[in-house]
Amino acid sequence: MRAARMFVKKLARKKLVPHRVKAELFGSLGHTGKGHGSDVAVLVGFEGELPDQIDTDTIPSRLEEIRNSQTINLNKKHKIKFLESDLVFHRKKTLPGHANGMKFSAFDAEGNLIKENIYYSVGGGFVIGENTEQKPIAEMHLELPFDFQTGEQLLEMARSSGKCISSMMLENEKTWRSEQEVVNGLDDIWSTMSACINKGIRTEGVLKGG
């Protein structure tokens, strides 16, 4: 969802309004995409949504509208053509940067390619563009205050530092963002989880994928 939104925002910044867009998912995303809802995420991402802001109750009706009308509301501003064949799952192909790769393409009315970008989903909700780093993603590394590879190492760090595991994880998170941002993010996660639990208790029927 984030990657698709990044693509349409880039189109908007360049003042490009395509006649049609296409999404291709590679590697793990291509192999398990529909089962994990990646197709849904791409479609609503093209419509400008973010995972932490979208009203999930509206998704089924929006998907039905896209399929019935064969159009998508690009970035919530432009109705453009979108066919089911414009969402491609490459189950046996990968992109060079990472196992979870996506390629988004935009075309004009004559079918000419006007913009194309590659993105990688690198875990933890993070998405980077193809040119974010010059070196391969696998080589990217940040120095963490408590860098561990095993549970045994983590416990030894707790003993030697006198810190509990949650305190050490907070210090690691502060490598990327401020402590207040971490706390606010955790509050958002808990609110989402709590709402999901309450919705599950109230709702009847069969859970998708179950």
Spans of model-derived segments:
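Conserved phosphate/anionic-ligand binding catalytic regions in large, soluble enzymes, centered on
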Residues: 1-4, 35-37
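Non-transmembrane, aqueous-exposed alpha-helical and coiled segments at domain scale
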Residues: 2-25, 57
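Short, N-terminal intrinsically disordered low-complexity segments that are rich in Pro/Gly
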Residues: 1, 32, 179-182
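A structural signal for small-residue-enriched, beta-sheet-centric alpha/beta enzyme cores
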Residues: 116-120, 162-169, 183, 194, ...
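Accessory "access/gating" subregions that flank catalytic or transport cores
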Residues: 176-210
